[in-house]
């Protein structure tokens, strides 16, 4: 059994999914994961499908050097964004895996929320490229590990209103003013 970096608050109402050494760019996947964090599973699935179709963008907040601006990033309150298709597809597969794990556990799939999602760097894979004058440069790939925990969102029940309204405390100054007004 692999250790997750976070234990769910209520393990009976949670499901997990993880992938190791995935051949997808770490930086793009990290930005995509941050975008879907806290979303409902249906909303996240629709969003990731829209990213692959370039209908919605992923805001690039940390790894944004040289990332161009796009109008779709405005809805996130940001200027820079991209459409990392491969990262979105990998995260879609992981959401599908988590959904099937939830069904196996007997959880309500429609009320699942992405409580925790984390992308870590995996060991780099090394290749080489040949340059002018007989030199050789590295040609590395940056794979990643992804883990996510989905939790059933509990229905928030409002507190019942108290039948007896508590008396408001009135300062001495206001009391004197009220008595003065009553005399007149």
UniProtKB/Swiss-Prot annotation:
Component of the large ribosomal subunit. Keywords: Cytoplasm, Ribonucleoprotein, Ribosomal protein. It is found in: Cytoplasm. Its main location: cytoplasm. GO terms for biological process: cellular response to amino acid starvation; cytoplasmic translation; positive regulation of G1/S transition of mitotic cell cycle; translation at postsynapse; translation at presynapse. It comes from Mus musculus. Residues 160-184 are annotated as: Disordered. Belongs to the universal ribosomal protein uL22 family. HAMAP family: Ribosomal_uL22_A (MF_01331_A). It comes from the Eukaryota. Component of the large ribosomal subunit. The ribosome is a large ribonucleoprotein complex responsible for the synthesis of proteins in the cell. PROSITE patterns: RIBOSOMAL_L22. This is Large ribosomal subunit protein uL22. One of its GO terms (molecular function) is structural constituent of ribosome. Residues 167-184 have a biased composition (Basic residues). One of its GO terms (cellular component) is A band. The gene is Rpl17.
